[in-house]
A protein has these predicted regions:
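Short, conserved catalytic-motif segment at the N-terminal edge
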Residues: 25-82, 102-107, 111, 161-168, ...
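Short active-site loop at a secondary-structure junction
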Residues: 38-48, 69-127, 169-182, 251-254, ...
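Bacterial N-terminal signal peptides
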Residues: 6-17
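Peripheral terminal and inter-domain segments
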Residues: 352-556
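Boundary at the C-terminal end of the N-terminal hydrophobic targeting segment
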Residues: 19-23
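Short, surface-exposed loop or secondary-structure junction motifs
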Residues: 63, 67, 120-330
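Short, well-ordered beta-strand elements
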Residues: 314-315, 325-342, 442-446, 532-536
Length: 556
């Protein structure tokens, strides 16, 4: 049961905690402390951060409370959870197996995991590690099955059982990039079957042990007592904190328990690249290209990009209330590692703040975005307003004119004129290019390291009770066996979730609806125009098919 920490208790503890087992701060320490000022309290969960340069510790700081109930502060010995920063360890383990000659990263996954054969498409190990496999993400699949993460304890075997039922992918392998935790659970299965050892045994023998990572282990079972582990929390000091422990046995996509020092031992091995670690490092950061040639920034378990003029290899992580980040700057030989035990912590923002302090003059100055001084006539902006639909991702743009600017009302982005029929997202790098014909308009959205997405203008639907009644009824996913029921009430289409209540759908275009969380449902019809089912696009899951079982009742 999650428990609320009373505010009165928190108020009695509102004092800084940096004096806990930490030496006199250096000037660099004080600048790093400013990044974590919000966590420097005995009333809040906290963080630990470490920075190394050329293998030499520069910073070791801890803030806030590791355990609010036991009133235990964070220290450098506190064990926390990695979130998705764990993925690089699974990728490294498979690279080691490839170096051994046991397998190839370009092997068909089905060689080791026959559960994927029902999909009928060749997926390589490399594609599972680079999120280009097309495998739908497990979190959404659990939700659809009515067994959501956080409420149900899932083991890796359950994820593999779902994979065995899949008959389609988000896209053909290699055609696109879409983050998938499922891919890493499949990768763990490949590793364990190819090596004959558990993930824990293999990584202990080949990675943790050799690198002296004595406080590192996989969270194979969340029920196991781990001395020195910080519990995880959600909430804020204003609302109170609740326990937010990962209630799951899934590991490999996340679920690595470790300390800051162990994190940095791993990063140091990647920096030095001695022996086989050089080949591992280079494999993780090698450029991945989609089938049509686009280079993506994600490699195998890490992202490699350029930030303010310096090369950066990084990953962040979040599971439950745990947050983590590991940033490595190869040319400066600097590593930044952080672990936090509260969901409000922004690991990427914190790691970037620390890197800004540590790298200093090595960074290019932050230049203010200077948009071209272009004025677009109001009538020209009004002509672009409307709804645009991507057949590839099923995403929808709703462009509106607000205060003289073109705005994506669903995504919240403000579009700045950039010359011709081009616009750029204010404060971002995505570019919108508009093309028009006599009958329609299209928007092409591009961003660095991503495949372009084309959207075509669609008309807003005409909504009547009779039109909505055509969608009402019961549906089921043939892959997951999950039911879904639609009803019409008060002039709206709703998903009836029984005791969980109802979800109101927003009409977007003919047969297309949006759920409050952004998920898109598109109903399908036969040659006679009758509703036969629908397909769902939900973030990291695309075109999940549901077949119609029964028609619904009349509106009420």
């Amino acid at each position: 049961m999650r428990r609320l920490v009373p505010l009165a208790f928190c108020a009695t503890l509102a004092t800084p905690t940096l004096l806990h087992a930490q030496g006199a701060p250096t000037p660099l320490d004080r600048r790093v402390d400013s990044v974590f000022a919000a966590f420097d309290r005995t009333s809040t969960p906290g963080c630990a951060v470490g920075v190394d340069r050329n293998g030499t510790p520069l910073v070791r700081r801890a803030y806030g409370m590791a355990d609010l109930e036991a009133r235990t502060p964070w220290t450098m010995g506190t064990i926390s959870e990695s979130g998705s920063t764990a993925k690089q360890f699974v990728a490294a383990a498979l690279v080691l197996l490839a170096l051994d000659g046991t397998l190839s990263l370009d092997d068909d996954v089905a060689r080791w995991v026959p559960e994927v054969r029902g999909i009928g498409k060749r997926i390589t190990i490399r594609q599972t590690l680079s999120h280009t496999s097309g495998l739908p993400d497990r979190y959404t699949l659990h939700d659809v099955e009515g067994r959501p993460a956080g409420e149900v304890d899932h083991p890796n075997a359950e994820v593999m059982a779902i994979v065995a039922k899949l008959r389609d992918l988000n896209f053909d392998p290699g055609e696109d990039y879409l983050y998938s935790n499922t891919g890493y659970v499949v990768a763990v299965a490949v590793l364990e079957r190819a090596s004959g050892k558990s993930l824990q045994s293999f990584t202990q023998e080949r990675i943790f042990g050799p690198l002296g990572m004595t406080d590192t282990r996989w969270r194979e079972d969340h029920r196991v007592v781990v001395p020195g582990r910080a519990p995880a929390y959600s909430g804020t000091a204003a609302t109170g904190f609740r326990n937010d422990h990962p209630f799951t046995r899934v590991h490999g996509s996340g679920g690595l328990l470790l300390t800051i020092d162990d994190f940095l031992k791993w990063s140091g091995a990647m920096q030095r690249g001695e022996g086989r670690w050089g080949a591992v490092r280079d494999s993780l950061s090698a450029v991945i290209r989609l089938n049509e040639g686009t280079a993506i920034t994600y490699g195998l378990g890490v992202t490699t990009d350029t930030w303010r003029g310096v090369r950066r290899v990084s990953h962040t992580g979040s599971t439950g209330g745990y947050r983590a980040a590991l940033y490595r700057f190869p040319d400066q030989q600097v590593s930044v590692a952080l672990l936090c035990n509260v969901g409000s912590a922004n690991p990427g923002g914190l790691a970037t703040g620390v890197a800004t302090v540590v790298l200093g003059d090595a960074l290019e100055p932050v230049r203010a975005e200077i948009a071209p001084m272009l004025a677009v006539p109001p009538e020209a902006l009004a002509a672009l307003a409307g709804r645009y639909h991507s057949a590839r991702t099923e995403e929808v743009l709703v462009l509106e004119v607000r205060n003289g600017h073109l705005v994506d009302s669903l995504g919240g982005a403000v579009l700045v004129p950039w010359g011709g029929d081009r616009f750029r997202v204010r404060g971002g790098t995505a570019e919108f290019a508009v093309t028009r014909s006599a009958t329609t308009a299209q928007v092409r959205v591009t961003a660095p390291g991503a495949r372009a997405t084309e959207y075509t203008r669609v008309e807003a639907p005409v909504i009547t009770d009779a039109a909505l009644a055509a969608y009402a009824g019961a549906y089921r996913s043939p892959e997951l066996g999950a039911p879904m029921t639609f009803v019409v009430r008060d002039g709206a289409l709703l998903i009836d979730q029984g005791w969980r209540g109802t979800v109101r759908l927003q009409p977007l275009y003919r047969d297309g609806f949006r759920m409050p969380g952004g998920e898109i449902l598109r109903f399908t019809r036969d040659a006679r125009g009758r509703i036969t089912g629908f397909v769902a696009w939900a973030g990291r899951v695309r075109h999940l098919r549901f077949d119609r079982l029964t028609a619904g009742a009349a509106p009420r």
